[in-house]
Amino acid sequence: MKAAGGLVDRDGGLRATSLDALARLNPVVPGGAHTAGTSSQISDGAAAVLLADADRARALGLRPRAKIVAQCLIGAEPYYHLDGPGAATERVLAASGMTLADIDLFEVNEAFASIVLSWLAVHRADPDRVNVNGGAIALGHPVGSTGARLLTSALHELERRDASTALITMCAGGAMATATIIERL
């Protein structure tokens, strides 16, 4: 990718650090827990996901790889807005008639490390099925293409494992959150 400073050929995060350096970081708000060390870096990214009716895709010679089983967008209590992915998970499971046991993989976006930890505490999902290739702290948080990145990561991993279903959830800003369940075809 070309940028003003030349060619960008490597990821800008993660930087070298230590536990001592992380412990010295100030929280975002006085008395808070979130610091730059517990947050994902905002990274450059671009993505495209083609959504189409299955018949139209086939008419165009395209092979559908997955279908959307259910999805939702919810508003969370603004003071507790980081709980949104948990509430969205409950809503999308109810809409689909599925349970956590029906889901093979989970992608839970983590703008802050506490989001996925809270989600795990609430839902008690198997941590070995959550963000199996790393979450936003490891991979970056490409604002504007995070949903596409999560969905694509989930679909590729379903194909690698020959698994069937994934649940993707993330904060959507302004105390909103979304969740989607996909089924590999």
Segments predicted by a language model, with ranges:
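Beta-strand segments within the central parallel beta-sheet cores of soluble alpha/beta enzyme folds
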Residues: 1-4, 62-73, 101-110, 129-135, ...
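N-terminal extracellular/periplasmic Venus flytrap/periplasmic-binding protein-like
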Residues: 1-59, 122-129
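Structural signal for hydrophobic packing residues in well-ordered secondary-structure cores
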Residues: 26, 72, 93-96, 116, ...
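Conserved beta-strand-centric core segments of catalytic alpha/beta enzyme folds
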Residues: 35-52, 147-185
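Short, glycine-/Ser/Thr-/acidic-enriched flexible segments
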Residues: 55-57, 137, 173
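Phosphate/pyrophosphate-binding loops at sites that engage ATP/ADP/AMP, CoA/4′-phosphopantetheine
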Residues: 57-64, 90-105, 120-124
